[in-house]
Structure formats: structure tokens, C-alpha cells
Design a protein with these regions (language model features):
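His/Asp/Glu-rich mid-to-C-terminal helical/loop segments that flank catalytic regions of hydrolases
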Residues: 109-155
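Metal-dependent peptidase/peptidase-like ectodomains
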Residues: 2-107
Length: 155
């Protein structure tokens, strides 16, 4: 979605051509850079995912995500969650344009690596087992959102 040039795809989607009208959009679950390992963690502990923004606009979204983790048993790591974090990950992926439109969002992320935004970031470097567990968490979060009788509340 052209995030390397200012998140243009998500901006276009939210501002001009949403598949689902923005006022009917419940949440955005953004998966970006989830298939690798954070070098700080190494390959010893791959059973994690960084969670960014889940509690900014909705406590309900945050709690649904935590509850959905019973199916994947990941370490939900919130170290980058702060909107004032020096790395500014909260502002650096496609979920941000949804948040700007008052749509709660979660940015799922496994960390920056040496191939970040480089042509060397290729499919054979994906770590599929931890990726599968991360996707399982997102699936169950989405399932709960889609099947809930009530819309999640905004703060």
C-alpha cells in the first residue's frame, strides 16, 4: 500500500474508496512485518507478537485481542505501544489512517530486521511457525469482532 511513500494506499482507501463505508468499519487489524524475528529477541523466543495501538481508541478492542490470545498463547508484547515511543511505530503503518478516522486499530508486528524495506526481504526468510501463531491470534480477534452482538465502544 505504498507505506514507503507515506501510507498512500491506506490513505486512499480511508479517504476516497473504502470497500466498506468508514462509518460501518468496526476496526482495523493491521499485519505488517510479522514473519520475521526481532534481532533483539533472536530465534530463542519466537512465541511473541508486538501489539501497538489496541488500547488507544477502544478498551473493548484491547480486551478482545487479549482474550483471543487463549487460542495462540503468544507473549503479547506492548513495549512499542506508546504513541510517544521514540520509534514512532504507532504512526508508521497502514492502521494509522484508520485511527485518524476514529476507527480502532491494532498493529501486529514482529520487529524491525536488517531487510526492512529492502529487496532482500524475501519469502524464504519468513519464519512460518511463529507467523502461523500470530495469524491465529488475529483470526480469533477478527472472529470475535465479526460475531459480536454489540459494536465495540470507543473511548
Amino acid at each position: 500500500t505504498a507505506e514507503e511513500r507515506g501510507l498512500l494506499g491506506s490513505k486512499y482507501y480511508t479517504d476516497y474508496d473504502p470497500l466498506v463505508p468508514i462509518n460501518n468499519t468496526i476496526a482495523n487489524l493491521n499485519m505488517d512485518m510479522m514473519g520475521r524475528a526481532d534481532p533483539e529477541r533472536g530465534v530463542r523466543n519466537l512465541n511473541y507478537v508486538y501489539i501497538i495501538g489496541s488500547d488507544v481508541l477502544s478498551d473493548d478492542l484491547h480486551e478482545i485481542n487479549i482474550d483471543a490470545n487463549k487460542y495462540s498463547n503468544l507473549e503479547l508484547d506492548f513495549r512499542f505501544n506508546g504513541i510517544d515511543h521514540p520509534d514512532q511505530f504507532y504512526y508508521r503503518s497502514d492502521h494509522f489512517h484508520f485511527i485518524k478516522n476514529n476507527i480502532p486499530a491494532i498493529f501486529y508486528f514482529s520487529g524491525v530486521h536488517e531487510d526492512y524495506h529492502e529487496p532482500t526481504d524475501t519469502a524464504e526468510k519468513i519464519l512460518y511457525e511463529p507467523y502461523k501463531r500470530r495469524v491465529k491470534l488475529i483470526f480469533h480477534t477478527a472472529w470475535e469482532l465479526a460475531n459480536s452482538k454489540e459494536r465495540i465502544k470507543l473511548k
